[in-house]
Structure formats: structure tokens, C-alpha cells
């Protein structure tokens, strides 16, 4: 089962937590769920250049709090915070409620599965050789502390007439071990020959305590230990 299921969904409530953190009754649950989907789709399209790793949505008492994890937060914030204010107003219109916006910097994008998948997809669209893009991503992740990584690319790779799947793996990626901290991300590359799919699994070590927030807390501590840059976390009320 661990080989087929989404590794993040498999570990929810064990060492991972949900990206949508709110409760609702049956009457409004569907509406709020669709709002979340629209918000994520809008942010992923609008902020494509900012490298969005994930979007966390919380809804405390008829308000909405959106936390964007980004590799390039400066592109979201803009000059003197002008862009982030426009974005906050747009999200307020979409949710019909007061919206707060937080920006959190991802200081090690090389070990974030979603950002790695997006990077490989962008390289495929620029006609970079898929083997070179995959090997470079594997080497960068292992150099920056990943204990294991697996990448698969599927589609008409290199313009071949018959679609196929190619993969690389280095280190351990124990998908069936629930205490393993596995990050998983996907992306699509729209090439001239059709769409190529990219999947990335990154093993960051084991989490022994039973805590749904453990993975998120561990990622924050790892970013803080990385040093070098100033804290780009910003809250816009």
C-alpha cells in the first residue's frame, strides 16, 4: 500500500497535518472546500515565479488566514508591501471575509519535493535533457541533507514517439514506514510533444514522536539552522 498511496495522505494525523485547518457543518462545508481549491489554483497560477511550496488555509471565526510557503517571498511582497496588499484584497473578495496573509520563506528549496518537481518541469519546458535535470536535482538534495530521494518523469521524454517512464533514486526512500518523514510533490511540464509528469519523493529522516505537527516543526527548525538569510516571514492583517 505504501508504494501506491500518496505519502502525505498516508501519514496525516501521524507526523503530518492537513493544509486546510478548519471545521464546518454540512451546510457550508462544500462551499468552503471549493473556496480553498479556488484560492490554491489562483495563487499557484498568479505566483508561479515565486516558487510556491504549499498554501495553508485556516478559518478562525468567520475570518480566513492564508499562509504561503515560498522560495522567493520578495516577489510576493513587492516594493514596500504593495503587491501583498493587492493580493490580500483579491483573496478577501474570493472568500467574502476578512483575510490575513502570511508569507513564510522556504530556505532550502532543494529539499522541498514540490519545488524540486516544479524546477524539473520548468527545465523540461526549456528543452533541458531530462536525465541532466533529474541528476542535478538528486545531487542538490543529497548535498543539502536529504537522506534519500526518488524522481520519476513520464511522457514523451526527449520527443520520443512512445511515452515512457524514467526514474532515479539515491539513498533510502522507505514509503511503507509510517514514522519516515517523506515529502512528496508533483508537477506537469507542457512541452511541444505533450505533457510530461514529474513526481518527487524526498526522505528527510525518521520522526519518532506521534505528533501531526512534527514534520512542519522540523522543517522550520531546519530552515532556521540553515542561516545566512534574514527571516522573511511577514504577516499582513
Curated annotation (Swiss-Prot):
UniProt GO cellular component terms: cytosolic small ribosomal subunit
Pfam families (UniProt xref): KH_2, Ribosomal_S3_C
Functional summary from the UniProt entry: Binds the lower part of the 30S subunit head. Binds mRNA in the 70S ribosome, positioning it for translation.
Residue ranges occupied by any KH type-2 domain in the UniProt entry: 39-107
Gene3D superfamilies per UniProt: 3.30.300.20, Ribosomal protein S3, C-terminal domain
Subunit structure, interactors included: Part of the 30S ribosomal subunit. Forms a tight complex with proteins S10 and S14.
Keywords, sorted A to Z: Ribonucleoprotein, Ribosomal protein, RNA-binding, rRNA-binding
SMART domains cross-referenced by the UniProt entry: KH (SM00322)
UniProt protein name: Small ribosomal subunit protein uS3
InterPro entries: KH_dom, KH_dom-like_a/b, KH_dom_type_2, KH_sf_prok-type, Ribosomal_S3_C_sf, Ribosomal_uS3_bac-typ, Ribosomal_uS3_C, Ribosomal_uS3_CS
NCBIfam families from the UniProt entry: rpsC_bact
GO molecular function (one): mRNA binding
Disordered: annotated span: 213-237
PROSITE patterns attached to this UniProt entry: KH_TYPE_2, RIBOSOMAL_S3
GO biological-process terms attached to the record: translation
Recorded name of the encoding gene: rpsC
Family: Belongs to the universal ribosomal protein uS3 family.
Amino acid at each position: 500500500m505504501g508504494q501506491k498511496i500518496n505519502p502525505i495522505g498516508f501519514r496525516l494525523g501521524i507526523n503530518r497535518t492537513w493544509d486546510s485547518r478548519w471545521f464546518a457543518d454540512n451546510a457550508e462545508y462544500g462551499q468552503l472546500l471549493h473556496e480553498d481549491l479556488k484560492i490554491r489554483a489562483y495563487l499557484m497560477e498568479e505566483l508561479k515565479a515565486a516558487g510556491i511550496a504549499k498554501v495553508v488555509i485556516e478559518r478562525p471565526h468567520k475570518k480566513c488566514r492564508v499562509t504561503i510557503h515560498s522560495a522567493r517571498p520578495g516577489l510576493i511582497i513587492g516594493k514596500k508591501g504593495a503587491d501583498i496588499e493587492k493580493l490580500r484584497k483579491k483573496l478577501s473578495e474570493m472568500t467574502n471575509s476578512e483575510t490575513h496573509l502570511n508569507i513564510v520563506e522556504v530556505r532550502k528549496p532543494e529539499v522541498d519535493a514540490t519545488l524540486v518537481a516544479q524546477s524539473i518541469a520548468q527545465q523540461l519546458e526549456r528543452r533541458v535533457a531530462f536525465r541532466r535535470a533529474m541528476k542535478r536535482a538528486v545531487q542538490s538534495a543529497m548535498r543539502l541533507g536529504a537522506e534519500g530521494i526518488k524522481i520519476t518523469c513520464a511522457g514523451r521524454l526527449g520527443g520520443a514517439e512512445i511515452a515512457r517512464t524514467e526514474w532515479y533514486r539515491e539513498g533510502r526512500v522507505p514509503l511503507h514506514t509510517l514514522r519516515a518523514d517523506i515529502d512528496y510533490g508533483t508537477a506537469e511540464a507542457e512541452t511541444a510533444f505533450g505533457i510530461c509528469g514529474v513526481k518527487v519523493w524526498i526522505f528527510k529522516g525518521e520522526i519518532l514522536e506521534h505528533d501531526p505537527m512534527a514534520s512542519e516543526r522540523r522543517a522550520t527548525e531546519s530552515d532556521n539552522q540553515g542561516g545566512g538569510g534574514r527571516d522573511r516571514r511577514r504577516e499582513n492583517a
